[in-house]
């Protein structure tokens, strides 16, 4: 089945591409060096995993997806390439926020105007139904830039961004496959394979990070899949298994809830404290879980399972309609955050800060390296 072929191609390309990327990054001393106050790793780690993810994704899509099944393919690849190049340059030498946001807005306009993939209907949320063209473009651009940055900001501990990305892409692969949109299902499963291949090296002990070149692209593909799903479910009947999707906005919010809620939360707190919303701190959800003494793996698992439970809730409560379901999801997220805040206030522990050294100081082998060793032995 082509779906399986695309998945395995993406996965294997990443698995075999990352070791030489790590070797080159170590040789050229291209590392992720966090600020002193925010160190949570034992060593400086290469952050070019996005190179393997994006390359495998593009290769699999270009090789296996006919243009007839995905008419937007060239525009999607072009827009994704903008973010990949900007992210890669930022990973290597750093870029000003103005340049990064400029690239993100250019990327969003390509999707909203040239590709004509737009959020067109809010289904009564805030009293808004079908929007005119200009309002639709404006909202779409804001949402794209917001979600792209949300995934960029959630990429703070081992495995988190990639695990959430797997959950997002698998959900949409299933939905598009059921809806008969095979090209979009192929695109989503290509991303799934690339991310799982990357996770072999990103689960603790992480050997590589995806970097901005990976997280920006991940956020971009996730939000494009979301917008396409909204358009599709507005135009035709779609089911999640046997459950008819009648509250599509609620389902999309549930799929993206952890990165979106976390970003809105930290931005709000920073502004309430009279700081720039773009000032880096250690107040993200994953940092808060680490402060309870949880490991990276435990924190990643909790957040990914929580996000998945929101999706299950959204699917189960489709009968509520968009306005009520969106309100319930937001209320649940706020209450959960409040309970976490109370729990942290009682059981907080200091986050252990490990010494950062140049190069791979920790000798444990990642799962991906163990797999490659087994293959070479055979």
Q: Where do the model's predicted regions map?
A:
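Membrane-embedded alpha-helical core segments of multi-pass
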Residues: 81-82, 86, 103, 107-118, ...
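A generic, lipid-embedded transmembrane alpha helix
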Residues: 45-62, 109-114
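Alpha-helical transmembrane segments
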Residues: 1-29, 54-70, 74-81, 161-292, ...
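Juxtamembrane helix-capping/reentrant segments at transmembrane boundaries
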Residues: 34-48
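Transmembrane alpha-helix boundary signature
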Residues: 59-71, 89-95, 112-126, 232-236
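Aspartate-rich (DDxxD/NDxxD/DxxxD) Mg2+/diphosphate-binding motifs
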Residues: 36, 90-101
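Membrane-interfacial loop-to-helix junctions in multi-pass transporters
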Residues: 131-142, 185, 247
């Amino acid at each position: 089945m082509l779906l399986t072929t695309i998945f395995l191609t993406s996965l294997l390309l990443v698995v075999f591409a990352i070791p030489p990327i790590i070797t080159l990054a170590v040789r050229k001393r291209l590392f992720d060096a966090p600020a002193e106050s925010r160190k949570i790793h034992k060593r400086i780690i290469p952050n070019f995993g996005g190179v393997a993810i994006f390359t495998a994704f593009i290769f699999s899509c270009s090789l296996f997806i006919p243009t007839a099944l995905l008419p937007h393919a060239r525009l999607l690849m072009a827009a994704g390439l903008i973010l990949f190049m900007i992210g890669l340059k930022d990973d290597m030498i750093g870029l000003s926020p103005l340049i990064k946001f400029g690239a993100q807005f250019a990327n969003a306009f390509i999707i909203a105007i040239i590709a004509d993939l737009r959020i067109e209907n809010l289904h009564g949320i805030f009293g808004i139904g079908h929007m005119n063209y200009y309002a639709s473009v404006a909202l779409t651009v804001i949402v794209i830039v917001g979600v792209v940055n949300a995934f960029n900001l959630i990429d703070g501990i081992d495995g988190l961004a990639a695990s959430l990305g797997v959950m997002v892409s698998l959900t949409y692969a299933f939905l598009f496959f059921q809806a008969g949109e095979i090209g979009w299902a192929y695109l989503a499963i290509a991303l799934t394979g690339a991310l799982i291949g990357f996770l072999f090296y990103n689960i603790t002990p992480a050997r590589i990070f995806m970097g901005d070149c990976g997280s920006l692209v991940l956020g971009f593909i996730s939000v494009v899949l979301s917008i396409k799903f909204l358009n599709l479910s507005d135009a035709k009947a779609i089911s999640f298994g046997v459950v008819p999707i009648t509250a599509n906005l609620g389902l999309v919010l549930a799929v993206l809830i952890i990165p979106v809620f976390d970003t809105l939360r930290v931005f709000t707190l920073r502004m309430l404290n009279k700081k720039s919303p773009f000032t880096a701190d250690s107040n993200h959800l994953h940092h808060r879980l680490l402060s309870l003494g949880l490991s990276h793996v435990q924190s990643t698992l909790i957040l990914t399972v929580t996000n998945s439970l929101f999706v299950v809730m959204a699917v189960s409560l489709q009968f509520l309609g968009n306005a009520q379901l969106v309100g319930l999801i937001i209320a649940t997220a706020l209450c959960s955050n409040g309970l976490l805040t109370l729990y942290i206030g009682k059981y907080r522990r200091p986050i252990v800060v490990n010494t950062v050294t140049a190069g791979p100081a920790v000798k444990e082998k990642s799962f991906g390296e163990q797999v490659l060793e087994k293959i070479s032995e055979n």
